[in-house]
Amino acid sequence: MVDSQSATEFTNVISTQEQFRHAFDDFTYYTDTLSTYAYTRDSVPYVLSGHLNKNDENFGDYSENALNNSTLFNALEERDYDMYLYDEDLAWYGKKDFDIKNNPGTRNVSLRFGEYFKQEMRYVWFKYLPYGLKKASEIEKLNFGNTIDKFKWGNDVLYNEFNNVSEIEKTSGAQFRFIHAEGAHVPLDMDENMNRIKDGTYIQKTTATAKLIASFINRLKANGVYDNSVIVIMADHGYQPKNAPENYILSRFNPILLIKGVNEKHDLIYSEKPVSYLDLPQAYEELLDGKQSTDLFADIEYPRTRKVIWYEIYKEEHMVEYETDGKATEWDKFRETGEIFDLSKK
């Protein structure tokens, strides 16, 4: 999973740049996909669990209950998979024993005081700036995650690991890895070659994201574990450019979704099936049963009504359901269904 990667820009990058000409062969790319949520907070637990958040309970309880009853984890457990979750922010204090080998909710970590102090002072300095200076300043990102020893999601960090680690550990048992990478998330601070810069563009960071994914695929190939792997490349949600038209906010619901089954071989296929993340639980089951990506979503075709759940950032207590009969990029066709999920009214 890469963060904040819209399908439109990703398609533009991989279809026009020579370096990606064959990078995604063997995959089916579902370009007309709709995510269920527009933000990471709800999208990640939904993708992993198959359970929707409709504000029936506070988010902490929802996330724990959803993951404890994950249809995906249950399917993996039944097939004796070893499971690993790599995510900077996913804190799951689960009660059900799914034997997550590196469960971020139960792992002990060590605090690096110097890094913590640096991040804390950035916050304090900004908080107490005079208002006039505050208007001309901003803190794009506070990296409190750097203060502890845990998984780092940075594209550059992962790219270095994928390209410079000499060996990977192999096992005869079935393995599941969920990796949540930075992707095209703001700030737009990365060029096409993984260098951190100021005032970058979304296309630059999208190119870096594609390069990161390609390096991961090459790493699997080099170690002989590519062909027998199911690979799902996805984003938690898409991206809304600054100063975009009002309805462009709905571009956050059009993430990338590319899938490869076991021993699948063909040129990259672009599919315009009207897929929804609500279809993922069934797709997971079919992939685990050996289906190829070209055989997924067999009964899905236009016209189809798809639903999403929208809320404004930091106003998650008020959710509004939308539906559309159009393509993921036809934002003028989205309409409210009348369903509203308010936490305060439960």
Where are the regions a protein language model picked out?
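Active-site-proximal alpha/beta segments of enzymes that process anionic O-linked groups
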Residues: S4-E192, E286-L288, S293-E301
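Metal-dependent active-site segment of extracytoplasmic phospho-/sulfohydrolases and closely related
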Residues: Q19, A208-I249, P281-E285
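Membrane-interface soluble catalytic domains
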Residues: N69-R79, A91-I100, T106, N218-G224, ...
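Short beta-strand segments
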Residues: L85-D87, F176-G183, I203, V230-A235, ...
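Active-site rim elements
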Residues: N58-S63, I197-Q204, K242-A244, E264-V275, ...
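Active-site-proximal segments of metal-dependent phosphoesterases and phosphodiesterases across multiple
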Residues: M190-I213
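Short, solvent-exposed loop/turn segments at the edges of secondary structure
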Residues: R41-D42, R252-N254
